[in-house]
């Protein structure tokens, strides 16, 4: 049973890769070469718009960036960002 689940997951992954091929274009190369482009501010929103006051206080000062080279200083990794076919690290402080 575990083998069937594993094979199904691999087949689904293969279909996803074929449906979303990675293309090496000049645009992607230009994006990687520009140092100012690696730090992009991201608006992060969680849950219900009427959230509790405790949640509002803790999320009010949350600032996140999509970084290509990892998090800096007091930031910590909170996931990934995607811009086109490029994946970045979501760093929040």
UniProtKB/Swiss-Prot annotation:
Biological process annotations from GO: defense response to bacterium
Gene Ontology cellular component list: extracellular space
Keywords assigned by UniProt, alphabetized: Antibiotic, Antimicrobial, Defensin, Disulfide bond, Secreted, Signal
UniProt tissue specificity: Paneth cells of the small bowel.
Transmembrane parts of this sequence: none
Signal peptide: 1-19
Subcellular location per the Swiss-Prot or TrEMBL entry: Secreted
Maturation propeptide residues: 20-58
Record protein name field: Alpha-defensin 16
The encoding gene: Defa16
């Amino acid at each position: 049973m575990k083998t069937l689940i594993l094979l199904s997951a691999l087949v689904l992954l293969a279909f996803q890769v074929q449906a979303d091929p990675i293309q090496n274009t000049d645009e992607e190369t230009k994006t990687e070469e520009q140092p100012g482009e690696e730090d992009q501010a991201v608006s992060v929103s969680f849950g219900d718009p009427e959230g509790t006051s405790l949640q509002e206080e803790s999320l009010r000062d949350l600032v996140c960036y999509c970084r290509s080279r990892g998090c800096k200083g007091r930031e910590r990794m909170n996931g990934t960002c995607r811009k086109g076919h490029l994946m970045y690290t979501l760093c929040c402080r």
